[in-house]
């Protein structure tokens, strides 16, 4: 895959505070990003955007790849769920583990998908 790491935001990382364990949060977000890279088109782009307000900090991880069906969107966070075409490379615990870590720390994770892109939304409540 062609990976281009750019920071297009003017948001300074020192401006953001997320409650919880740094290492576990990093693992959860890295897992979601890795998944987005693996399932993006060959020349696709994975975008990471962060919004921060008084109520929550949200991380949006967006990729361009195959659309996730409504059924897939409901099952993607279930332990051991893996698409048949990816079963050789996946144990199906990455996204469920990320979800468990995020929720254990008071956050939420969701996914939205259409023909153009898939977006994982992680919100950490302040």
Model-derived segments and spans:
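Short helix-loop "hinge" at the ATP-lid/N-box region of the Bergerat-fold HATPase_c
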Residues: 35-37
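Short beta-strand/loop element within the Bergerat-fold HATPase_c
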Residues: 43-55
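Conserved micro-motifs of the catalytic ATP-binding
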Residues: 13-20
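Short conserved segment of the HATPase_c
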Residues: 68-80
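A residue-level detector for a conserved hydrophobic packing site
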Residues: 25-29
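Short alpha-helical Gxxx[C/S/T] motif in the catalytic ATP-binding
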Residues: 94, 98
